[in-house]
């Protein structure tokens, strides 16, 4: 039971911090990895990992494929919204559309998979900590904790981004570069979480609001809480 408890704590930590970062830098209270398509891309990467023979054999290929899927989703959404001068509404809309596309591709993978593969993928998509063991904990702990510490280090920049791109530029911060870097870190964290627990939605949406009502809106205090 101890690996599952540790896994639940790590996944909750990762999703909550990723959601808090996305809500702050996008200035949108509904932003989180699930609604922006990051979780959908990670799930698609894991689904591909489960059906490709040489990937399914490797034990630690799931976190890698989940990170790649999440990163590709972020790149697609970022490329679409950059044409509209990075409108927050267009970013959220693009993320939701991409999430539906990823879900459709996962269903397409289901239709061409074997019954045993479908069973394992359905069990994974429902979200579960039953298969977590110590080797998996060791694999995800280092990148997840490192990602959270990096976000804590950039907490001041995240707070400045909440003022808007123009004011952030006047304060010596390059908004687009910082935002792109933060997207990569949140993709890494989300990929690690999805790889071990499957699709768990709305943790990254609810927890930042709950903790914000307790410790306030400052990013450093919010991440530590």
Which stretches of residues belong to each language-model region?
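Alpha-helical transmembrane segments in inner-membrane proteins
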Residues: 1-225
């Amino acid at each position: 039971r101890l690996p599952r408890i540790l896994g639940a704590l790590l996944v909750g930590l990762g999703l909550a911090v990723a959601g808090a970062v996305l809500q702050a830098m996008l200035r949108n209270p509904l932003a989180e990895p699930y609604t922006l398509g990051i979780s959908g891309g990670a799930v698609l990467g894991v689904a591909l990992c489960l059906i490709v023979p040489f990937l399914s054999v490797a034990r630690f290929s799931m976190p890698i494929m989940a990170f790649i899927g999440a990163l590709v989703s972020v790149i697609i959404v970022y490329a679409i919204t950059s044409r509209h001068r990075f409108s927050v509404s267009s970013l959220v809309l693009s993320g939701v559309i991409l999430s539906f596309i990823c879900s459709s591709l996962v269903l397409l993978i289901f239709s061409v998979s074997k019954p045993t593969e479908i069973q394992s993928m359905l069990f994974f998509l429902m979200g579960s900590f039953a298969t977590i063991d110590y080797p998996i904990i060791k694999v995800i702990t280092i990148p997840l904790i490192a990602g959270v510490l990096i976000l804590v280090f950039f907490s001041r920049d995240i707070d400045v981004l909440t003022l808007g791109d123009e004011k952030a530029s006047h304060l010596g911060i390059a908004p687009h570069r910082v935002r792109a870097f933060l997207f990569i870190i949140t993709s890494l964290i989300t990929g690690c979480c999805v790889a071990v627990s499957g699709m768990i939605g709305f943790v990254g949406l609810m927890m930042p609001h709950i903790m914000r009502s307790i410790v306030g809106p400052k990013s450093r205090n919010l991440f530590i809480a």
